Amino acid sequence: MFEAVTFDYWNTLFFEPPGYLRGLRLDAWERILLAADRPVERVAMETAVDRSWEIFNEAWKDNRQYSAVDAANLVVGELDLHDLADEIRAELVEAFITIGETANLQPTPNVGIALKALHDAGVRIGIICDVGMTPSTILRGHLDRHGLLGAFSHWSFSDEVGTYKPDPRIFTHALAGLGTPEPAAAAHIGDLRRTDVAGARDFGMTAVRYTGVYDDPPADGLPEGHHVLEDHADLASTLGL
């Protein structure tokens, strides 16, 4: 019997259309720079923003924290905007960080059904999320707006815990917040083999790879989940609840 279940956030609880938040950031920076009489070609901004993601991905794999502030400052440097007035630079950084607040992010299909089934079975529910360019405060806001935040007893966001999956410390943090069940009595649902599946399996949890939004392709040295789940409506039965 499972005592606790944790969920990844991106492409497991919520999803965005490909490039959606990237486009919102670019649009915001374009408006700010135009108003400051410092227009920058769109393609140059795209290249700089994509470079910030490359740096993030390197840090993520090395388990080094890399925040949206770091990324925004890198983009400023890539665009050679060092001489901007402080208030304009601050506006750019703020837009980069907070653009997700008003974004139309959507819960993954049937995730509400899965959360209710777990709650009805007496299972404690948590989140283990690797935060990218959108801070955890904003991610919680989307859960709240869609009426899902109350389903969770605890959350472990990397920008608050200070480490990314598959580091066992973030799994330890999550289970400690859920009453410290044995890992064998807990399951983790997520889409990525390297972080979600490998991290959960190495920690002794049941790993469920969710494919309803993104089906992470096989890669050498990366494990498969104990279960593969396409529809959240089937989660409770998959776990035998």
Predicted region positions:
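N-terminal helical cap/lid subdomain that shapes the substrate entry/recognition surface
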Residues: 1-121
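Asp-based, Mg2+/Mn2+-dependent phosphohydrolase catalytic module
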Residues: 1-5, 15-19, 39-43, 106, ...
